Amino acid sequence: DDYTFDNFVHGNCNEIAFQSAHAIALSCEEYTDSPDTNYSKKKPKASNYNPLFIYGPSGLGKTHLLLAISNYVKTHRPDLSVLFVTSENFTNELIESIRSGKMQEFREKYRTVDYLLIDDIQFFNGTKESSRMEIFNTFNAIADNDNYIITTSDRTPSDLKDFHERLITRFSSGMIAHISPPDFEICSIILQK
């Protein structure tokens, strides 16, 4: 709960990433329940940011932004499902689900969330072809349901080696936001906190 938008120091080095993540978090207030259908969603404001791909060197606040989205949505709309996972944990859970014959449970968990937040997606790099296809199909299922996918990486989508071209295209289809090292002014603010 320490990760919020209020305590994220932002400036020129990370403003686009901050504003995009914040818009996606605020979009949770636009979800509506409709009596005709059990659960219809309307997200006009932040849909241009979906999927959101935040990239930059380690230690600059990418994970903070993911957790800020998660905390905001969980606080303001506890009825919505938010899932934060590292790429390593996602891959380990996928492998375990394959081994134990529980792929249906895995798919239900990941493909039906309103907000899927995956940290350090570049670590999917060494996964097997079948795992990468599962990742691609998971992303498609979420996108087809107009739900949010937010990922972080230390490199651009086009620099993700050994990734399916279709997955790179999916990452690139929304907002790509770069976080660069902070300037002197931002460093000063961070040090004062």
Regions of interest found by a model, annotated:
Residues 79-113:
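Short glycine-rich substrate-engagement loop in P-loop NTPases that contacts/grips substrate
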Residues 174-186:
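Conserved AAA+ ATPase "SRH/arginine-finger" region at the nucleotide-binding site
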Residues 39-66:
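Walker A/P-loop nucleotide-binding motif
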Residues 95-99, 157-173:
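Short regulatory helix/loop adjacent to the ATP-binding pocket of P-loop NTPases
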Residues 123-151, 155, 165-170:
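Conserved catalytic/switch belt of AAA+ P-loop NTPases
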Residues 63-77:
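P-loop NTPase Walker A phosphate-binding motif
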Residues 119-121:
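Walker B catalytic acidic pair
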Residues 1-18:
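Dynamic helix-loop-helix/coil hinge segments at AAA+ ATPase domain boundaries and subdomain interfaces
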